[in-house]
Regions:
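Radical SAM/AdoMet-radical enzyme domain recognition
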Residues: 70-93, 97-215
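Radical SAM enzyme [4Fe-4S]-AdoMet core and its adjacent flexible, acidic
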Residues: 153, 162-169, 173-272, 276, ...
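Canonical Radical SAM [4Fe-4S] cluster-binding loop centered on the CxxxCxxC motif
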Residues: 29-71
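A short acidic, helix-capping loop that chelates divalent metal ions and anchors anionic groups
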Residues: 59-63, 151-159, 221-225, 307-308
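Residues that scaffold the ATP/ADP-binding catalytic core of kinase and kinase-like folds
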Residues: 48, 52, 153, 158, ...
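Short, charged low-complexity linear segments at domain edges
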Residues: 14-34, 256-270
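Glycine-centered loop/turn positions within well-structured domains
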Residues: 47, 152-153, 280, 306
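Radical SAM enzyme core and accessory elements
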Residues: 3-27, 279-360
């Protein structure tokens, strides 16, 4: 028997779980289906962004996961395939910084062999220029690149003095040349840190085909010193941008899309706003997360997860693993962003998992 600890109970599950069919959906306690999977392939990063991996915590002596604990490309592919049997159709490879894995092209190639999968990757772009062609050839369709400012001093501060804007822009151009599409740019906005550079960034990418998306600064993990008064809401940003370039809202591409989409009325492209703090979207969250060491989380703000690495390496059957995943999702109750600020949430906040471990 396998025992799942957490979520207020012990879920006892027999090893004789019946395997679901490829079309078998599973829903959580709030009737939310499982559609998206984020796979963090590495817990390391070449940046030290203060809102994710502050350098004073993750310095030179910090002990990350032993490499032997990382899931192999074959294990990653297997788990992704099992998730697809429960309804997953969209998969995003993340980190840490995923391009730091020497076998990242092999990982992408293996995932691309899974039929009917919408495959994307999120990166800080620092290493993308040299890998874009190989990733595209391996089957990568879409890419999202993090870039918090085009002001060199601001960018250096927000990357922990590790980033180089020129490298990121070279990565964006390389992605465009090889045909990765769409290319999205994620911008985390903090008050008095980079909010004054937002309009310049929009101006730079308007008309380029790159979709810029602004993300409200979130209280992911416990080490980034998050404060509500440092959040710049999507409403404020949208009004600032709309004052300079008229915007028009457009329908989401699919139910559960996290970004609110707008297009420029003059036809110069699209931007988006991700409002996890001011307008939580828990009710339509269909996403699970798999960490580099094989731990599965059901929320970005999770306090705990279930590790399947040992089961994978001990010869567990697909039926056993699917039953485990099914039970995990069926008992999912997460609605943290909607509960943010309540006393019960504040009491447990210090145990949340850090973002670099489960993928942003």
């Amino acid at each position: 028997r396998t025992y799942l600890m957490g979520w207020g109970s012990i879920l006892e599950m027999s090893s004789s779980v019946t395997q679901l069919t490829a079309s078998g959906d599973v829903k959580d306690t709030w009737n939310r289906p499982l559609r998206d999977l984020r796979i963090s392939v590495i817990d390391r990063c070449n940046y030290r962004c203060p809102y994710c991996m502050p350098d004073e915590v993750y310095g030179d002596g910090y002990e990350f996961l032993p490499r032997r604990h990382w899931l192999t490309p074959g294990e990653i592919k297997r788990v992704a395939g099992l998730f697809m049997q429960l309804g997953v159709t969209k998969l995003r490879v993340t980190g840490g910084e995923p391009l730091l894995r020497k076998d990242i092209v092999e990982i992408v190639s293996g995932l691309n062999e899974l039929p009917g999968l919408d495959l994307a990757l999120t990166t800080n772009g620092a290493l993308l220029a040299g890998l874009a062609g190989e990733l595209k050839a391996a089957g990568l369709k879409r890419i999202t690149i993090s870039l918090d400012s085009l002001d060199d001093a601001v960018f250096k501060q927000m990357s922990g003095e590790k980033g180089n804007i020129a490298n990121v822009l070279e990565g964006v151009e390389a992605a465009r040349i090889v045909g990765l599409s769409p290319i999205k740019l994620n911008v985390v906005v903090q008050k008095s840190k980079n909010d004054h550079t937002v309009l310049d960034l929009v101006d730079h990418f308007r008309g380029s085909g790159v979709i810029v998306r602004f993300i409200e600064y979130m209280d992911v993990g416990t080490l980034n010193g998050w404060r509500l008064d440092e959040v710049v809401t999507s409403k404020v940003l949208m009004e600032q941008i709309d004052e300079r370039w008229s915007l028009k809202p457009v329908e989401p591409n699919y139910r559960g899309e996290v970004a609110q989409r707008y297009v420029f009325e003059d036809g110069q492209g699209e931007i988006g706003f991700i409002s996890s703090v001011s307008e939580p979207f828990c009710g339509d969250c269909h996403r699970a997360r798999l960490s580099a060491d094989g731990t599965i989380y059901t929320c970005l703000f999770a306090k705990q997860g279930i590790c399947v690495r040992e089961q994978l390496r001990a010869g567990a059957s697909d039926a056993d693993l699917i039953g485990l995943l099914q039970n995990l999702w069926r008992h999912r109750t997460d609605r943290y962003s909607e509960q943010r600020g309540k006393e019960t949430t504040k009491k447990v906040s210090k145990s949340r998992i850090e973002m670099y471990r489960m993928g942003g």
